[in-house]
Amino acid sequence: MDERIKEILLEKLNFSINQDGEIQKLIACFENVDFNSFYTGILVGRLYNSFFYQYRRILKRNPSNMEFKEFVDFIKNNLKMFSK
């Protein structure tokens, strides 16, 4: 994965975690959902969106299959940050 994009994803992850109150308000709108799963899903969704957007914005192309696999590894390597 391009190092610039990896750095942006780390910033996005830290920003999203710091927006915890907003995420909790969003989750509170739904009944009978597992908080941790929903919280993780929101964070992964934000990162996924940012991953594709930044590739198009910075590199002017879609990420390759290998870069997407590296993104998945990025998520796996940072899972402990997703826990609430």
Task: Enumerate the predicted regions with their spans.
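Charged low-complexity stretches with an acidic bias
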Residues: 56-84
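Short, charged, low-complexity loops and linkers
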Residues: 27-34
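Acidic, low-complexity, intrinsically disordered interaction modules
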Residues: 36-57, 61
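Residue-level signal for secondary-structure boundary elements
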Residues: 17-25, 55, 59, 83
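Short terminal alpha-helical segments
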Residues: 1-27
